[in-house]
Amino acid sequence: MYSSDAPINWKRNLTITWIGCFLTGAAFSLVMPFLPLYVESLGVTGHSALNMWSGLVFSITFLFSAIASPFWGGLADRKGRKIMLLRSALGMAIVMLLMGLAQNIWQFLILRALLGLLGGFIPNANALIATQIPRHKSGWALGTLSTGGVSGALLGPLVGGVLADSYGLRPVFFMTASVLFLCFLLTLLFIREQFQPVAKKEMLHAREVIASLKSPKLVLSLFVTTLIIQVATGSIAPILTLYVRDLAGNVANIAFISGMIASVPGVAALISAPRLGKLGDRIGPEKILIAALVISVLLLIPMSFVQTPWQLGLLRFLLGAADGALLPAVQTLLVYNATNQIAGRVFSYNQSFRDIGNVTGPLIGASVSANYGFRAVFLVTAMVVLFNAVYTGLSLRRTGATALPAQDVEKDDTSLVR
């Protein structure tokens, strides 16, 4: 379709990867509204057993993703990022299809683990775009790309619930597999990458990857920052609906109110992420990162004292606007400190820390709420984010944020990457 030596239009690749991240985010979240119902349909009975199995099938995907991500990242640095996008999209499509055919809970659990092993579309999309964009536009591009997964994750539960009510639980898995296969086709036909495969013996080992970074200590601290961001985000998820019900009292549309309050941070992040990413390109992503963490602390504390669902919704909207800058700012700093040759592994390591946060965050939130009540979760989360802000600030001060090379700053907005 394209000449192999033709220049790569990174903006077109950004558009297609955004669509791919949107479809992947939607596909993952399509099944979330009825996951416990599907577990129940596979023969799990009893309140405690249903809770346990629902938690297992949810968390095992992130756990196995954390294990597999470094392997896929290394393979991406050897074979190219496009082939990893194709592998991920097609693999997840096949697994989703098989999930719709599962006959018992053990089969479903194994398939959820396999989904984590074969995933990784979004981190590989980040790595692909990070190696093709002009460095001085990293914040804007990665911020824009992040909105793809966020918007898909917002739309997915709504569409998934409607589809499950209309067609039943199993057909939704087949529809999800179709969405992922569409993602595979779009990637195959329209994503372009010029990549020279690297022999395995020439690949850097993990220690050499870390040593080759411009600022290894800063990058390691950014991995920890990513983990804490996800812990803070996930800690609120298990108790949000119950907290909203306590605030709302006896109202008929509690599910609608809870859904609205759950989704408003994502809507705010869609608006803020590209804009704050672009601002970070001008003033430095490290400033955006610290400011967003501090603002998050100031918004989390009053959430513990709200009296109505709408007060909580307003604060969560503002929190989403701040949170929309966090991961893109981290990713931009990673781009500044890693060469293209190791970008796949750096982003995959970051994804592993993110997955660990996705697993541990809900556990922490559920534990705190069980012992100290719903309101305490927001105060504990605020303390976690405050620690993150202080830790990140000290790490940036000790290591210094790496400035953009002058030649990157001078590139024109319409640059094509060869």
Swiss-Prot record:
The chain crosses the membrane at residues 19-39, 56-76, 90-110, 113-133, 144-164, 171-191, 222-242, 251-271, 288-308, 317-337, 376-396. It holds the Pfam family MFS_1. Keywords: Cell inner membrane, Cell membrane, Membrane, Transmembrane, Transmembrane helix, Transport. The keyword Membrane applies. InterPro entries: MFS, MFS_dom, MFS_MdtG_subfamily, MFS_trans_sf, Mutidrug-R_MdtG, Tet-R_TetA/multi-R_MdtG-like. It comes from the Bacteria. It is found in: Cell inner membrane. It is a multi-pass membrane protein. GO terms for cellular component: plasma membrane. GO terms for molecular function: transmembrane transporter activity. Belongs to the major facilitator superfamily. DHA1 family. MdtG (TC 2.A.1.2.20) subfamily. NCBIfam families: PRK09874.1. This is Multidrug resistance protein MdtG. The gene is mdtG.
